[in-house]
From Swiss-Prot:
The keyword Ligase does not apply. Keywords: Cell membrane, GTP-binding, Hydrolase, Membrane, Nucleotide-binding, Protein biosynthesis. The gene is lepA. It is found in: Cell membrane. SMART domains: EFG_C. GO terms for cellular component: plasma membrane. The lineage of its organism: Bacteria, Bacillati, Actinomycetota, Actinomycetes, Mycobacteriales. This is Elongation factor 4. It comes from Mycobacterium sp. (strain KMS).
Amino acid sequence: MCRRAPRSIPLRCAHAPRRDVYQEIPISSFADQTFTAPAQIRNFCIIAHIDHGKSTLADRMLGITGVVADRDMRAQYLDRMDIERERGITIKAQNVRLPWEVNGEKFVLHLIDTPGHVDFTYEVSRALEACEGAILLVDAAQGIEAQTLANLYLALDRDLAIIPVLNKIDLPAADPDRYAGELAHIIGCEPSDVLRVSGKTGAGVRELLDEVVRLVPPPTGDADAPARAMIFDSVYDIYRGVVTYVRVVDGKITPRERIAMMSTGATHELLEVGIVSPDPKPSAGLGVGEVGYLITGVKDVRQSKVGDTVTTARHGAKEALTGYREPRPMVYSGLYPVDGSDYPVLREALDKLQLNDAALTYEPETSVALGFGFRCGFLGLLHMEITRERLEREFNLDLISTAPNVVYRVEKDDGTEIVVTNPSDWPEGKVRTVYEPVVKTTVIAPSEFIGTIMELCQSRRGELGGMDYLSPERVELRYTMPLGEIIFDFFDSLKSRTRGYASLDYEEAGEQEADLVKVDILLQGEAVDAFSAIVHKDGASAYGNKMTTKLKELIPRQQFEVPVQAAVGSRIIARENIRAIRKDVLSKCYGGDITRKRKLLEKQKEGKKRMKTIGRVDVPQEAFVAALSTDAAGDKPKK
């Protein structure tokens, strides 16, 4: 009798290949062997504005060079974080080692993928330090944007070989001839020198890799000198501790030797040295010009600072490589858990995030209104938003963030100086001078919007620094503006006034003296610290009116009348009243004597009066969230 196979056992031919067996065999190539001759190495990066197809082009390169099999390929292969993949942006710089042959000669290409957003300019500048060339990638349908220019200037400062490339030539809206002329005008080359590729279809990518080999110079360095390597990124791995990405400049680095960090003097034993192709692979070491990773078992990212120089502990180099600076926070905001019992979880979450993000700073603070929380420092608004989103998503936290503000330097009348990152630290009494940070902003937009952009920038206390036409249709405007005016909703206003066509970039430009005041919001005569803000004297009454009107709508009515006031020092500049709820005390009186009714009304009036003197206003959590989030609506860049 023929027995049927039980349903739970899948029937499979004996010769059918098992997916899980061959999936684990990594693709290997000649690029997996380290200590390649420097003449055969090319280190390059891709610089582009957000959404110009940088990660898609990197995906095509991984596929064409064969380091990722077609079946394992996924979109944005190098973007590891969920947020990066969802938003379509690159936050952490990644690197990958690619094999490539030109006319039978074998080359090793190191591609370093960089972020495009202004907040992560420091990540870009470090990645550029590890390269000799850069692909300047521009969307053939949109043209050059402000952040592309900013990153191009960073690359030119470092004398990198620039390869101009137009991407997305397969789009129906693409106009490669027009934008090739624009690119050529900026870089100073011929329009015919601009390569045309499509990251989506792969058209022109092989020719681009050939150009990288031809135009990017090989790395230079002394193989016999003491080892020197520059750290351009470090990430935290929960199993292995800190993984440090380096580019070797001189000498060689091999496993099991002791290394020293030149900025701190700390020494560690090297447990593993390897390359990324595109997954980490241990190797025998790294030679001149090579890019790879080091694992020392250290648990704190701050011990391997990006931009620092690694050397050997014995007979190490005497002089560090240049280019290291501490990333400085530009924007501060308070983060508070909605549920007060989540405070320890938030502390632990920030600790873990800081392992991966050296630019994030935080310190505990308390607010009368919001309870315990942290004052966090960020590189910019996108950095702040992404940090908050990661905290909420990866650690299941519900957070309230206070309106962002910048760092002010205040000189008091007695000559002492304090640094203010929080409105509640603003000194009471006489202030001699206040200094606020200023930034140089670059706005690129169609020339029809010049008038509306100038009007917006002037309303934000901007000073025009210059204006250039990139082409008859596109213009570049340069303004110097206070950072405090940009961090609220400047980006949103700019986008809405230019129908989304304008792009913005900014960089630090020191500080300037300013006439700033602290506006307090008073409920029932008591200041609520969460709503305080530092604003320019001319904009104080506008801020006061906006907040009092908003709170009048958000705070529920009480048994007594509640005044909502905005004050600068002891001077009230705006006021709204939340009307009292009145119980109908005359409902029991059917007709009857008027004096009886009057007596009841007088009694109610007395009660309300007494309530007003001793009553407290409880602001519900939802009102805080609504007031602060609508106030900081500019946090969210338009997608």
